[in-house]
Each structure stands twice: as structure tokens, then as C-alpha cells.
């Protein structure tokens, strides 16, 4: 499973010229240079903040210095300080960009109503403001008003069809509504508009996989992996897609990469263990699944897989203990009941095996392996 989050608009630092008061011309000209240096740093560091602060001291009417300082403090995580500077900027000049920036800070502070008020004030003056519409959509989503948020973003897309962030957020919302075709279309558009946007490529791959478009999923996820070679999520997703395509060596390579990058990643360990079982590499599967079991000892799936690997190597006592642990933890795990049935069958306990196969089929009528096993022991 993955979680998707809406992205708020990125507000750029200002480098535009300023009106220089005649009585302080030299000081304000120096302030302009300080602001330019701050923009060049642009990392929210103490050094950047200090430059804007000095610029304000020299030229108190330089609105860009207040605004940029607010954004720098926002990047530092100093939201109260950021709010204060952005409000000072608005006092000097009631600008749409300043209010959008303030709304973003208020949202990060958890002041949803205050943030919404700022976006709405911008839209009253300029109904075509795409950043304000994007921000309003984020708030509507937080208020569980997803259909309204979608309509808001569709309006933004009509105003500016070149904004990749609008389409990315549309994809996230359509996905939340389980409109997977629409989500895939929105993510695809976002990628077309900005081929460097990792999240759009990654989520496009996830949607294509969910829709069964495995080759399209492969292409999108491979493109995402090229953008962020060390991102664990994309390699996990690639491993799943490769496995569905029957490309087990590539799936194994992806999972091993995740296990190497993040040894405590449970999903990678258990999926690698299952793949090793399919490849009949039972000893390594057992070692891998033991690692997974140490990470999540209450997960029935890992105990079922571990029991199956031990069963294939003839470690009957350990296999039975682990398979019974699996059904104890999750009595609805059809695979665990089937695997336990296979073990009991091999131990000559046909009646008990028959009962486990029947339970597996009752839980999952489409589990063909359990049906075939039941036919072998006799219904």
C-alpha cells in the first residue's frame, strides 16, 4: 500500500526591483544586493535569514525582504516567524502572492480555516488564481470534501492547462475516489508536463499496475527509478510488476536492492522470501523469512511462507509450528490453511488435511491449489 498526498504550490522567492525611497537611496540599494544574495542561497539557512533581516534593517519598506524572509523561515520550520513576516509584507503591499504564501504557512500550522480565508480573499480579487485554487483544493480534501476539491482543480486546469501540479493533485484525488482510470490519466498528464516530477511517474506506475497495464506500469516505474535510483518505494513496486510479468530474475534483483538499502524493510524481506520459494531456493528463503519474522512477529503471512519453505525441506516439526502460528494469528489466511493441509497430508493425517483444504476453499473459493489438494485427499 502507498499513501499519496496533495502538493501545495511552490512560492518562488522574489527578485523584482523595489521602489527606492529618495531619503534612503543608498541604504535601499545595498538592501537590494542583500536580497539578491539571499535568493542565491535560497536554502532556509540562518545565513539566508540574516541577509533578509539586514536588508529590512537598512530599508524597512522593502517588501520583498519581508516576503523572502517569511519563506526562508517557513523552510526552517519556524511557522510563527514565517507568518509574522508574511503579514508584515501584506501590510506594506496587499499582493496575491503574499496572501498565497501566508495561506500555505497557516495550513502548515494547522490553521485550516484561517488558511482557507486567505485563499478565498485572493480568489475574490482574482478568480483565475491557480495557486489559490490549488491551495483551496488541499483544504477541501482535508475537510473530506473530495468531489468539491476535484471540481476546484478542474477549474484550475482549465485556467492553466500547463501546470503539472494541478494534474498531479487531480490524480491523487481521483485515486482517493477509486477512479483509477481518471487518476492514471491525470498522472500521465502531469508527467507529460513535467518529465522530471518523480511522484507523478511513480504514482502513474502504481495506477497502471492496479489497472493491469503491466508494461505501461513497468515503463513509468523504470522512469521513476531513473529519477530517484535510491527510492525504496519504486523498487518495491517494480519488483511486484516484474513478478506479475513473470520476470522473476528482475523481480528478485529489485527486492534484493531494497533489502540491501533497507535491511529492516519487512515488505522487501517477505516478498523476496516468497520469490525464493517460487525459485525453490528454500534455504535462503528460510533465512530471509526469519529476518522478516523478526521484524513483524505478528504477521501471519510471513509465518505461513516460512512454514511452507521448511515443509519443502522436510523440516516438519518447525513447519507445523509455524503454520499453526500463522492460522492462530490470522484464521482467515487461506494460504496458511492450505499449506498446513499439505503438511498434514504428508504426515499421513488425511482427515485433518481435508479439513484444512476445505477451510482454505471456504475462505477463498478461487484458490485452485487448495481445490486440487482437496481432490487428492478426497472430498
Residue ranges and their predicted role:
Residues 1-9:
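Bacterial N-terminal signal peptides that target proteins for export
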Residues 41-54, 75-88, 109-121, 143-155, ...:
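Structural signature of tandem alpha-helical TPR/SEL1-like repeats
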Residues 58, 91-92, 125, 159, ...:
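Structural marker of alpha-solenoid helical repeat scaffolds
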Residues 29-32, 278, 342-379:
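Terminal, low-structured helical/coil segments at or just beyond the last alpha-helical repeat
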Residues 20-68, 74-77, 84, 379:
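N-terminal leader/linker segments that initiate helical-solenoid repeat arrays
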Residues 27-31, 63-64, 96-98, 130-131, ...:
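Helix-start (N-cap) detector for alpha-helical repeat units in TPR-like alpha-solenoids
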Amino acid at each position: 500500500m502507498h499513501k499519496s498526498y496533495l502538493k501545495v504550490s511552490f512560492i518562488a522567492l522574489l527578485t523584482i526591483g523595489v521602489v527606492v525611497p529618495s531619503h534612503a537611496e543608498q541604504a535601499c540599494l545595498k538592501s537590494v544586493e542583500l536580497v539578491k544574495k539571499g535568493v542565491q542561497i535560497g536554502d532556509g539557512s540562518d545565513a539566508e535569514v540574516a541577509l533578509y533581516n539586514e536588508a529590512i534593517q537598512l530599508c524597512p519598506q522593502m517588501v520583498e525582504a519581508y516576503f523572502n524572509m517569511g519563506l526562508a523561515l517557513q523552510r526552517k520550520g519556524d511557522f510563527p516567524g514565517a507568518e509574522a513576516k508574511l503579514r508584515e509584507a501584506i501590510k506594506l503591499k496587499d499582493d496575491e502572492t503574499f496572501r498565497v504564501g501566508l495561506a500555505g504557512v497557516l495550513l502548515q500550522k494547522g490553521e485550516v480555516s484561517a488558511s482557507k480565508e486567505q485563499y478565498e480573499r485572493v480568489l475574490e480579487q482574482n478568480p483565475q488564481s491557480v495557486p489559490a485554487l490549488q491551495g483551496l483544493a488541499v483544504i477541501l480534501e482535508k475537510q473530506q470534501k473530495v468531489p468539491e476539491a476535484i471540481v476546484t482543480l478542474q477549474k484550475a486546469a482549465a485556467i492553466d492547462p500547463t501546470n503539472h501540479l494541478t494534474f498531479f493533485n487531480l490524480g491523487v484525488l481521483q485515486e482517493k475516489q477509486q477512479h483509477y482510470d481518471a487518476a492514471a490519466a491525470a498522472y500521465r498528464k502531469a508527467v507529460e508536463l513535467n518529465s522530471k516530477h518523480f511522484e507523478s511517474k511513480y504514482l502513474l506506475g502504481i495506477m497502471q499496475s492496479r489497472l493491469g497495464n503491466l508494461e505501461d506500469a513497468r515503463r513509468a516505474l523504470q522512469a521513476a527509478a531513473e529519477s530517484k535510483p535510491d527510492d525504496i518505494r519504486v523498487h518495491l513496486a517494480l519488483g511486484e510488476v516484474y513478478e506479475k510479468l513473470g520476470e522473476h530474475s528482475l523481480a528478485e534483483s529489485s527486492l534484493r536492492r531494497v533489502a540491501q538499502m533497507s535491511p529492516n524493510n519487512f515488505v522487501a524481506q517477505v516478498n523476496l522470501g516468497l520469490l525464493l520459494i517460487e525459485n525453490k531456493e528454500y534455504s535462503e528463503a528460510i533465512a530471509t523469512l526469519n529476518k522478516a519474522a523478526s521484524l513483524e512477529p505478528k504477521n501471519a503471512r510471513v509465518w505461513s511462507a516460512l512454514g511452507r519453505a521448511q515443509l519443502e525441506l522436510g523440516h516438519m516439526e518447525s513447519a507445523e509450528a509455524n503454520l499453526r502460528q500463522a492460522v492462530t494469528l490470522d484464521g482467515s489466511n487461506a494460504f496458511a490453511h492450505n499449506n498446513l493441509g499439505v503438511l498434514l497430508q504428508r504426515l499421513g493425517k488425511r482427515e485433518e488435511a481435508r479439513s484444512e483444504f476445505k477451510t482454505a476453499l471456504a475462505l477463498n473459493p478461487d484458490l485452485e491449489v487448495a481445490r486440487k489438494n482437496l481432490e487428492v485427499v478426497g472430498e
